[in-house]
């Protein structure tokens, strides 16, 4: 069973000043993680950082850090009680440059703490160490023993030193993303909800870059109007389920890359998916909402944040002037979400009002007919062309590759290919107005 300590990228960046003080001394942080089942083991997602008392450190030196007795007791009590809520205590501390691993002193103190926590009913203890300019390393204390544990910052995975790295000739040109890139993507499980004009090329591009574990969900079949914008389709594919077409494309791509595809495909609507189907999606590491309506994207967003998954959505929009049909904008967009920081609802990229209107479809009858008659639901589908879908798909896949390789992340990218206007936001929470979000948990500024 693989175990991974997951820290959202934005949270990690926020912790760095405390973990690596400007005076060069060591830093210490305590937090709580939530265990989330994954396909190959358990993800421990860091969700809560325990605030440190102003005088909580007894000493902080270039080669050592220690808590006061009062602060240590307070954190230990919280750590023990966290077991009642299914949470796991996490201790993070830094080392000087050149000392990348846990010290003998770390071993002794953590073993003593783990023994005490077990007696208090908390069977687990996670610990992380990171040297300045180095990579984080983690371990899990369980049953009196140390267990190997990977670290994932956002989508960037740091493996234990003993982990063998995958090398494939077909993927050699991706070496710029780092030696561990192929190994990392081969272990990530990707859920794709919506495998239409954007979702299908995203699936193939990911497969050709080494991803091989997929969960696909889409209730629709291929229609004649899809043939101009879905890769590799012909008239013979009309009537086939899109998830079956996408699965076949992924398998071909994986064979070309030298990997073996593992796919679960559901011919289901995310808004009416079964408990089992949602449970399987929840085990993914990354969830992509590539549908064309607000309701399904909000459903995906809730599922991802609740399950500790990385979330991204992408789409296209060709807007036309009412009456004349004149094109006013041609846009592609990629955005994401992070617990406690931002989400598409905070940023105005999803409209809950429109989602409530779309929900009337599932009520049916007079409710749906009235929504149609009053113009809340477009009578014609939005324009869509293969070239624009390909740009959105490529932008999304590149964003995923950047995140896996540790090359930074964008919270929101939008490009209007008609006017040339570009929006590229890295720290979305800094641009949001005061207020709280019940979806991502962002607190008032």
Q: Can you name each region flagged by the protein language model?
A:
Residues 122-125, 259-261, 307-309:
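A short helix->loop->beta-strand "cap" motif at the edges of active sites that frequently abuts
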Residues 178-223:
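Glycine-rich adenosine-cofactor-binding loop
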Residues 87-89, 212, 310:
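Short acidic/polar active-site loop segments enriched in Thr and Asp
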Residues 211-258:
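Glycine-rich phosphate-binding loop and adjoining beta1-alpha1-beta2 segment
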Residues 139-190:
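N-terminal charged helix/coil linker that caps or initiates catalytic domains
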Residues 135-142, 181, 189, 273, ...:
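Glycine-rich phosphate/adenylate-binding loop
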Residues 243-286, 291-297:
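A structured beta-alpha segment of the ubiquitous adenosine-cofactor-binding alpha/beta core
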Residues 1-90, 96-158:
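Conserved beta-strand-loop surface patch within small alpha/beta domains used
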């Amino acid at each position: 069973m693989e175990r991974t300590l997951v820290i959202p990228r934005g949270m990690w960046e926020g912790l760095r000043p405390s973990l690596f003080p400007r005076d060069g001394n060591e830093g210490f942080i305590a937090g709580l993680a939530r265990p989330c089942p994954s396909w190959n083991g358990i993800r421990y997602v860091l969700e809560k950082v325990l605030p440190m008392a102003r005088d909580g450190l007894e000493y902080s030196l270039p080669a050592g850090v220690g808590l006061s007795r009062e602060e240590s007791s307070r954190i230990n009590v919280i750590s023990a009680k966290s077991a009642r809520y299914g949470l796991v205590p996490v201790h993070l501390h830094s080392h000087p440059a050149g000392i990348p691993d846990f010290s003998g002193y770390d071993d002794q103190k953590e073993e003593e703490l783990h023994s005490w926590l077990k007696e208090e009913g908390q069977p687990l203890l996670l610990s992380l160490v990171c040297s300045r300019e180095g990579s984080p390393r983690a371990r899990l204390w369980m049953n009196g023993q140390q267990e190997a544990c990977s670290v994932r910052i956002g989508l960037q995975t740091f493996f234990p030193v003993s982990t063998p790295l995958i090398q494939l000739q077909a993927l050699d040109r991706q070496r710029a993303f780092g030696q561990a890139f192929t190994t990392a993507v081969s272990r990530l499980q990707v859920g794709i909800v919506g495998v239409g004009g954007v979702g299908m090329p995203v699936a193939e591009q990911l497969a050709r870059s080494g991803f091989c574990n997929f969960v696909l969900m889409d209730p629709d079949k291929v229609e004649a109007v899809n043939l101009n914008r879905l890769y590799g389709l012909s008239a013979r594919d009309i009537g086939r389920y899109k998830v079956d077409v996408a699965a076949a494309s992924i398998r071909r791509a994986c064979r070309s890359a030298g990997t073996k595809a593992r796919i679960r495909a559901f011919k289901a609507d995310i808004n009416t998916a079964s408990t089992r189907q949602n449970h399987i999606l929840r085990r993914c590491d990354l969830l992509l909402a590539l549908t064309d309506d607000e309701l399904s994207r909000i459903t995906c967003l809730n599922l991802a944040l609740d399950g500790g998954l990385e979330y991204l959505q992408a789409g296209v929009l060709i807007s036309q002037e009412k009456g004349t049909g004149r094109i006013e904008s041609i846009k592609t967009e990629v955005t994401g979400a992070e617990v406690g920081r931002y989400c598409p609802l905070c940023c105005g990229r999803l409209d809950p009002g429109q989602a409530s209107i779309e929900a009337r479809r599932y009520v049916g009858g007079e409710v749906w007919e009235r929504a149609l008659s009053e113009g809340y639901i477009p009578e014609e589908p939005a324009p869509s062309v293969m070239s624009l879908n390909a740009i959105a798909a490529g932008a999304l896949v590149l964003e995923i590759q950047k995140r896996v390789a540790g090359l930074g992340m964008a919270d929101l990218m939008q490009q209007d290919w008609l006017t040339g206007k570009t929006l590229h936001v890295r720290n979305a929470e800094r641009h949001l107005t005061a207020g709280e979000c019940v979806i991502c948990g962002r607190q008032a500024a």
